[in-house]
């Protein structure tokens, strides 16, 4: 894994390479994956160890305006539940983003969706909302070499892994139709199909 990642970044500046090297040293010997991986059917595999990737930010209770394309039936159902989103990016893509301000091929972003809770088991909380039960995991993947591209000419694909507190997410998932996630991201995400406007870690480094 180390040689494959370093081959992508031989031309990066030393400061950017330091970011990547620090991640690799911190995670050496643990079960990690970076970049997209697919099964024999062309479905994407849920990355291992993604919670140790670069955390780009979180948000609570985002609800799109009903008249815009983002409000699909799935988003409408999600809007009924106050939800936390926590987002991670694979370290190799983040190192490249620091250098160029753009998302390289490939890039993987993972978003966990949690139910917002206002009451803790011990009853200690007076006010506030915290992440409770996990509802699902979603992936945004920029990979022009991805399999199962029939009917799609887009570099970005989106995947949904159902899985709550009672069960682990599915091991693999197929790409959503372009008319669902991709169309919304293309219309409203601020930078290369990513909602960079919601995450200052990325927003401050993007380039036109």
Question: Where are these predicted regions, by residue range?
Answer:
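Sec/Tat signal peptide C-region and signal peptidase I cleavage site
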Residues: 27-31
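N-terminal secretory signal peptides
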Residues: 32-100
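N-terminal secretory signal peptides that target proteins for export/translocation
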Residues: 1-11
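Generic hydrophobic-segment detector
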Residues: 12, 96-97, 121-122
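Bacterial N-terminal signal peptides
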Residues: 11-26
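Sequence context surrounding c-type heme c attachment/ligation sites in exported
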Residues: 35-39, 46-54, 58, 100, ...
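Detector for methionine-enriched segments
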Residues: 1, 15-16, 71, 82, ...
């Amino acid at each position: 894994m180390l040689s494959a990642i370093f081959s992508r970044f031989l031309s990066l500046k030393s400061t950017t390479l330091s970011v990547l090297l620090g991640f690799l040293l911190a995670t050496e010997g643990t079960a990690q994956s970076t970049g997209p991986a697919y099964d024999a059917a062309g479905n994407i595999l849920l990355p291992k160890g993604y919670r140790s990737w670069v955390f780009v930010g979180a948000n609570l209770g985002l609800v799109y305006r009903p008249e815009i394309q983002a409000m699909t039936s799935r988003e409408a159902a999600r809007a009924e539940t106050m939800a936390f989103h926590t987002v991670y990016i694979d370290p190799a893509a983040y190192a490249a983003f620091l250098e160029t301000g753009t998302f390289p091929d490939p890039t993987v972003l993972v978003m966990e969706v949690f139910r917002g809770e206002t009451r803790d088991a011990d009853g200690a909380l007076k006010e506030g909302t915290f992440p409770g039960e996990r509802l699902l995991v979603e992936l945004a993947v920029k990979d022009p070499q991805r399999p199962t591209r029939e009917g799609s000419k887009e570099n970005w694909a989106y995947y949904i892994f159902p899985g709550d507190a009672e069960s682990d997410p599915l091991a693999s998932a197929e790409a959503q139709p372009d008319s669902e996630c991709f169309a919304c991201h293309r219309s409203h995400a601020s930078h290369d199909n990513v909602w960079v406007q919601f995450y200052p870690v990325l927003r401050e480094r993007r380039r036109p």
